[in-house]
């Protein structure tokens, strides 16, 4: 049983029609242009003469409106706040929801030590502003003692008042509720990823996922190592053999209780720490492998979010959890294992373990006869070589792959559709088993991994595989609404795809 205690994962979000007296800082948007910056429209919430005075001061101190630039100035006596923060939105002609989200996040990150802020960014896009502030204010300091814990001046913003012309309108309330739920789900995924493997191992991860599912009213099933052995989950067991902390398989199911509701299966790789096993990784940077359960974190958060939003879609997450360690009991290069469902696999490289646990979970997920299946994983270093650290790769059945990629780009997670070249498939043939877990060369590694997974997807299922090896974890400096560590990608993509399925089938 987990002893983990949940904590607030972001600021309180509220609607407001005016700048209240308890507000410490007013955040406004500033667009850039060749003839100088302009304050983004505030829908009359702040008097135009006040905005004109603010713009003059901002120009005088060098504010340009460049995207995510922040400039803080003292507030005039006409505003009931201590200061005003202008955050750059970039070109007004190119302004979209994602830029508002990023700029809101940049504003939140710059306002450490501030209690309550109000913002007019919500006039431009309420949902994007709410998500950006909530995600930008996320912090993870759970393992800092009093010696190094942030003091009052470094605490994140605790309350954000989103200014709109009609704060009591049903549409505004619904938009804010949805955005707050999405931000909480992304933060939940981040929290899992950021928790070190000393404190988040398979059994603990399973317990915490179970608790989230139970609280959300989901059907929960947890298979321990004995149940995995009994049912033939050879991929999960093989990967977990080297660790004293034994594997799990978690199933979280949300039912829309609607006749003929579309069925969506989610599968996420849950390697709580990946040393590479016997095919051990280099020491440099291995600490970042705490993020190797980023796919699992995202699907757990997404199925809970689908339930909270009450979407008219049946969603089931199947989540394999294991720790990939080298030891005298670990699987070896050259071993043959049997995946759930009967396919035999020659393990050429024990560091290509993610596809082994995913294959078991995909076969199990397909037994539910889903209409759609999305799997996501920090699967291949080749994803980063091909697409960098911020662009997920999407492979799968052509139509659904393109649909997922397009939606991801619309909401700002920017996944890119990738092919699965048929000529690579024969490179996964084995001389001693049905398949090998890697090819005998380094070309197209991300694509070959997807081809491996394709072998386990049932005929007729619309399938998308999202490789987030780079995008799930930010090991460099913060940007936009993304701090260092877990990013929560691709939670927003998956929930948006599920919403699109609900609307359009």
UniProtKB/Swiss-Prot annotation:
Native organism is: Rhodococcus jostii (strain RHA1)
Gene expressing this chain:
pepA
Query: Which keywords are on file for this protein?
Result: Aminopeptidase, Cytoplasm, Hydrolase, Manganese, Metal-binding, Protease
- Tell me a GO biological process for this protein: proteolysis
Q: What is the lineage of its organism?
A: Bacteria, Bacillati, Actinomycetota, Actinomycetes, Mycobacteriales
Active-site residues per Swiss-Prot or TrEMBL entry: 281, 355
SUPFAM superfamilies found in the cross-reference section: Macro domain-like (SSF52949), Zn-dependent exopeptidases (SSF53187)
| Principal place of residence | cytoplasm
Q: Which Gene Ontology cellular-component terms appear in the entry?
A: cytoplasm
InterPro entries recorded: Leucine_aapep/pepB, Macro_dom-like, Peptidase_M17_C, Peptidase_M17_leu_NH2_pept, Peptidase_M17_N
Cofactor(s) listed in the protein's UniProt record: Mn(2+)
Reported function? Presumably involved in the processing and regular turnover of intracellular proteins. Catalyzes the removal of unsubstituted N-terminal amino acids from various peptides.
> How is the co-factor bound, per the entry?
Binds 2 manganese ions per subunit.
Q: Where does Mn(2+) 2 bind?
A: 269, 274, 292, 353
Protein family? Belongs to the peptidase M17 family.
Binding site residues for Mn(2+) 1 = 274, 351, 353
| Swiss-Prot/TrEMBL catalytic activity | Release of an N-terminal amino acid, Xaa-|-Yaa-, in which Xaa is preferably Leu, but may be other amino acids including Pro although not Arg or Lys, and Yaa may be Pro. Amino acid amides and methyl esters are also readily hydrolyzed, but rates on arylamides are exceedingly low; Release of an N-terminal amino acid, preferentially leucine, but not glutamic or aspartic acids
Instruction: Please report the name of this protein according to its UniProt entry.
Output: Probable cytosol aminopeptidase
